[in-house]
């Protein structure tokens, strides 16, 4: 009987050992799988960190490039106007040099008037800069500054009778009001 018991115990122990071994193998397999998963996740984290740093550097480079482009835009925004101004200066220089040679002030006045008309024409067409403030215009306080007022009999509305300084508007915005003398009715 003892033999039978020992045999049964041995079988039980063997079965138990087999169960333990299987359980251990499962645990080992789970550990190996977990280690693989951890390694995969660590690699993925590393890749994502690398991608994040690259995108951050890319964005910083983009921001710097945009800032440089903005600075250049501001720096050279008036380049077209400056080219036109240089042409006007050339014409003025020619008029001055011509007047030194001939002393004909009527021709000098004509030349300077032509240059003024050229400047106003180009600025009007290209840049929408307009001059205003002429004798005979109705006085408009939003566009004209009355430096002096003269009372006369025959005026229905206040009217400009003398212009001290022309006014200018750019795209319908007043840059400078015209400084004028205004005539108005005594009544």
UniProtKB/Swiss-Prot annotation:
Question: Which family would the database say this protein is a member of?
Answer: Belongs to the GrpE family.
| Superkingdom of this protein's organism | Bacteria
What is the name listed in the Swiss-Prot or TrEMBL entry for this protein? Protein GrpE
Please name the GO terms that the record assigns under molecular function.
Answer: adenyl-nucleotide exchange factor activity; protein homodimerization activity; protein-folding chaperone binding; unfolded protein binding
Family annotation (InterPro entries)? GrpE, GrpE_coiled_coil, GrpE_head
Annotated organism of origin = Borreliella afzelii (strain PKo) (Borrelia afzelii)
User: Does the UniProt entry include the keyword Cytoplasm?
Assistant: yes
Protein encoded by which gene: grpE
What are the start and end residues of every segment in region (Disordered)? Answer: 1-30
